[in-house]
């Protein structure tokens, strides 16, 4: 987790890349295989989600960092970091996901199924996304996430 500081373009770029890639892949999986949406509905949803994910990626990263700091105040353990990642992911992503599905014409039943499934799957996805985001931040050389080579 990086230290709180001024806006960092590398951080925003890493957060955006991670959000777009991760949500496209996992969203399509959930929508088609679990929620019963057609490939076309899912592709429309994933396409619509790209600008949404671009818009929310950096704010989510800031929110996640805040949640990680709050979790670390309770316990510095890896378990608490995973719980904070999970809570951050579910509470931030579920409303945005429901709105995307509504816009692309998913039925109320499909929306409830997809969002509910996403919440359940997020027990793993939120933590996995946290690791993926950290890896992206390292790859983008975000200060606090990588060690410069001497």
UniProtKB/Swiss-Prot annotation:
Annotated localization: Cell inner membrane
TM stretches of this protein: 17-37, 48-68, 86-106, 111-131
Membrane-related topology note: Multi-pass membrane protein
One family name in Pfam for this protein: AlaE
GO molecular function, one term: L-amino acid efflux transmembrane transporter activity
GO cellular component: plasma membrane
UniProt main location, coarse: membrane
Annotated keywords: Amino-acid transport, Cell inner membrane, Cell membrane, Membrane, Transmembrane, Transmembrane helix, Transport
GO biological process, one term: amino acid export across plasma membrane
Role according to the record: Exports L-alanine.
Family: Belongs to the AlaE exporter family.
HAMAP family with a match to the protein in the record: L_Ala_exporter (MF_00914)
Name of the featured protein: L-alanine exporter AlaE
Species: Aliivibrio fischeri (strain ATCC 700601 / ES114) (Vibrio fischeri)
Gene that this polypeptide is encoded by: alaE
């Amino acid at each position: 987790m990086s230290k709180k500081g001024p806006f960092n373009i590398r951080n925003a770029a890493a957060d955006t890349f991670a959000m777009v890639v991760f949500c496209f892949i996992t969203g399509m999986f959930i929508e088609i295989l679990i929620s019963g949406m057609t490939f076309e509905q899912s592709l429309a949803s994933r396409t619509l989600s790209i600008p949404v994910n671009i818009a929310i990626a950096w704010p989510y990263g800031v929110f996640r960092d805040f949640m990680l700091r709050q979790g670390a105040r309770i316990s510095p353990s890896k378990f608490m970091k995973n719980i904070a990642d999970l809570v951050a992911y579910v509470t931030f992503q579920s409303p945005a996901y429901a709105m995307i599905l509504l816009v692309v014409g998913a039925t109320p039943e499909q929306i409830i199924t997809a969002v509910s499934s996403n919440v359940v799957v997020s027990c793993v996805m939120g933590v996995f996304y946290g690791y993926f985001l950290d890896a992206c931040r390292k790859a983008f050389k975000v200060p606090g996430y990588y060690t410069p080579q001497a």
